[in-house]
UniProtKB/Swiss-Prot annotation:
Organism lineage string: Bacteria, Pseudomonadati, Pseudomonadota, Gammaproteobacteria, Pseudomonadales
CDD domains: SfsA-like_bacterial
Organism (species): Pseudomonas paraeruginosa (strain DSM 24068 / PA7)
Protein name: Sugar fermentation stimulation protein homolog
Gene Ontology MF terms in the entry: DNA binding
Family membership: Belongs to the SfsA family.
Amino acid sequence: MRFDPPLEEGRLLRRYKRFLADIESAGGERLTIHCPNTGSMLNCMSEGCRVWFSRSDDPRRKLPGTWELSETPQGRLACVNTARANRLVEEALLAGDIPELAGFASLRREVAYGVENSRADFRLEYPAGALFIEVKSVTLGFDETAVAAFPDAVTLRGAKHLRELAALARDGVRAVQLYCVNLSGIEAVRPADEIDPAYGKALREAAQAGVEVLAYGAEVTTEGLRLARRLPVRL
């Protein structure tokens, strides 16, 4: 996935009201852009940090740009646009770059399932039956250990998805929790129990129920993103 048109560089002035960010471009222009991330963005939004944004010429848009990347205090690049994760995973699925999930006959997005009114990010159909996938974008890295963590804020919705996946697995349906690690320089992933212990508990229970827990690390550059390799998940 390449950024087209190319991203522009700037520095962060502030993020506010969840979906807004003020930045200063490399040319000194001050802009208010869209922040496409509902999380805390812990470690991705320190004042003055380098950011990269995409610009749109669509006259229907209220804001001229979208925040795409941040440089973390550890010098890593993080893709903060959470919508990119699903597109990146779909691109990898269709290219056969996730061997554990290869061989499907069809792919559907945003499929309703479960008893708690959930929507799976993807439903894949195989000769042996269906497979449901929930995708989570991971950008949180606490220190220099090269271990990323999820979530970066308490997520009741994320725990609900794990319960739904676990129920499928208990019924004999393949269910996958897939972490798309959009943070450079990462070697493993773990639940952020210090932020949301209930989510960590739900993840371990889902794994015990038969949910397949996968993590894939993206190659993150200012030119584009590519799902590069599988990473271990430390439960």
